[in-house]
Amino acid sequence: PSQADTRHRVDPRFYVMMFLQYAVYGLWLPIAARFLSASRELGGLGFTNYQIGMIIAVASAIGAIAAPFIAGQIADRYVAPARCLAVLLFVGGMIKFITAFQTTFAAWLWLSIAYAVLFMPTISLTNSLALAHLPDPKRQFPRVRAVGTIAWITVAWLFPVVWLQSDLAFRWLPPFFTGQELPNAPGRMIDSVRVAGVVSMVYAIFCWFALPRTAPKRDGAKTLAFAKAFAMVKQRSFAVLVAAALLISV
């Protein structure tokens, strides 16, 4: 290939980054409601629908609110984004792994909130890293981001096939492999949380050592820039929008 072609080629590291980013979430979230609600006799946790909503939706909403402060105030100003990404993912992976061994609603709720606060900023950090280093981000970023969607679909399909079924048979139509669900499938579903924790820690090591360095921006901006955003809540239309978004999230 010509030098120009090489210069405009997407670095494979960003494909790996985006795949692992969404594989971590896709491993456990699509089946979370089932193992959280399944009875303890079947190996589940026996939580109510209200409790499951708190664990999944409320924790995610709190994480999404905290994300701009962590990603914007810390990664963009004081710490290299790749290093910040690695730390958030490693600590989050440990929390996720510990969560898998908990059996009470309170433990799952607080650990899920802590995990969401750490994980949600990584979404914007991966986007920022890719956009900062891609030679032609307008054309190349959609392809890189699409790998994340492929990762979500792949792991959400592969884990149940490999770990929750037996006597698999191939078929030409999706999901391509079908079999008999194991009697203790709800109990084995919780293993997806453990695997997600391990994958997150491995991904963190990849981010620390493999991703390109991007220096934090020390542009003299206000230290507490998010205070300006909070001031917008005084505007009636913006306050209504925020309130509606929070209610929809719950």
What are these regions (language model features)?
Residues 83-97:
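Structural signature of the two symmetry-related core transmembrane helices
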Residues 38, 73, 154-193:
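Transmembrane alpha-helix termini and helix-breaking/packing motifs in multi-pass membrane transporters
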Residues 4-62, 238-245, 249-250:
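Helix-loop boundary and gating motifs at the non-cytosolic
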Residues 19, 95-96, 105-125, 129, ...:
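Hydrophobic core of transmembrane alpha-helices in multi-pass small-molecule transporters
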Residues 66-80, 163-164:
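Helix-to-loop junctions at the C-terminal end of transmembrane segments
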